Amino acid sequence: MKFFVIALIVLLGLLQYRLWSGDNSLPEYFVLQKQIAAQQDGNAKLNERNQVLKEEIIDLKSGTEAIEERARNELGMVKEGETFYRVVGGDRSVSSPSQ
């Protein structure tokens, strides 16, 4: 009986060692859970970005308005007969007269 109790204690010790510091231990599990959460956040952001790009592609394929808007914003193009005005100026501060 004494041998059986000692064997159970040794077995319990080995299992505890494996649980806390061996391969696939609890600390490793918690680290992996954090990595999974970070990866899922990154995947969600990338999925959102992909959705925006898909919508932009569909918009570009379907009509000329998106192409025209892109040409105006990115290439600085102007329609025929339009006048383009560029307002250039830095920060203008209004100074009040000192009394």
Curated annotation (Swiss-Prot):
> From which residue to which does any coiled coil extend?
31-73
Please give, as recorded in its UniProt entry, the membrane topology of this protein: Single-pass type II membrane protein
Stretches that traverse the bilayer: 4-21
- Give ranges for the Periplasmic compartment: 22-99
Topological domain (Cytoplasmic) residues are 1-3
Q: Which InterPro entries match?
A: Cell_div_FtsB, FtsL/DivIC
> What family is it from?
Belongs to the FtsB family.
Q: NCBIfam families of this UniProt entry? A: PRK00888.1
Please give the subunit comment from the record.
Part of a complex composed of FtsB, FtsL and FtsQ.
Name under which the protein is recorded: Cell division protein FtsB
Supply the source organism for this entry: Shewanella sp. (strain MR-4)
